[in-house]
């Protein structure tokens, strides 16, 4: 009885055992080895492309904000009782609202920026972390209506400073790369969240 049972078991499992001695078995093994590398490659490609796209959208938002600010009058900058809490000039609030609207049109969470008040000191800085901000981070918008940068003019004894509007934007980005790199490098540690920053400067027209 025992011998008969062994033969029956061998008959059942022999086809499966043969699989592991064929070329198909080698391919399965190669796939198992390559799978973690493939996962890291796919997630890494997705992560970096998403970060690049976000950077481009932030660039555009900052550029639009600076261009808009440069065309606004500066006679209200000493009047910080117009909007927000703490209050800030109406022209600065207008820049905040434009940047917030641009982010939302680009399908980026504005973290509640449109309802935030600016810092009490210049340059005016808005910090927003509500509305389900990614990774529990913070969006930071800084509006400087009196930013001056040196411009070289031929024949001048020194640089001339051009009064401009500068908009700086910082946004949290959550990486997923660190979740899969563990397959290749156990114990490897990468930042889960980083701030992507950008700025734009446009000379004031006023």
Which residue stretches match the model-derived regions?
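Alpha-helical membrane and juxtamembrane elements of multi-pass inner-membrane transport
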Residues: 23-26, 39, 93, 194
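Aliphatic-rich helix starts adjacent to a transmembrane/signal segment
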Residues: 27-73
């Amino acid at each position: 009885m025992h011998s008969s049972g062994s033969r029956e078991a061998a008959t059942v499992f022999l086809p499966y055992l043969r699989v592991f001695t064929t070329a198909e078995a080698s391919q399965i093994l190669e796939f198992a080895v390559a799978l973690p590398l493939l996962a890291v490659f796919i997630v890494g490609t997705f992560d970096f492309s998403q970060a690049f796209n976000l950077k481009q959208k932030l660039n555009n938002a900052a550029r639009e904000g600076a261009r808009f600010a440069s065309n606004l009058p500066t006679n209200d900058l000493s009047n910080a009782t117009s909007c927000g809490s703490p209050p800030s000039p109406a022209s600065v609030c207008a820049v905040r609202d434009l940047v917030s609207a641009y982010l939302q049109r680009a399908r980026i969470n504005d973290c509640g920026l449109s309802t935030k008040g600016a810092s009490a000191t210049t340059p005016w800085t808005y910090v927003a972390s509500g509305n389900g901000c990614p990774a529990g981070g913070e969006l930071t918008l800084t509006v400087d209506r009196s930013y001056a940068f040196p411009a070289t003019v031929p024949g001048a004894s020194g640089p001339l400073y051009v009064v401009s509007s500068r908009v700086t934007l910082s946004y949290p980005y959550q990486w997923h790369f660190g979740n899969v790199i563990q397959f290749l490098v156990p114990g490897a540690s990468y930042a889960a969240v980083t701030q992507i920053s950008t700025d734009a400067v446009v000379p004031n027209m006023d």
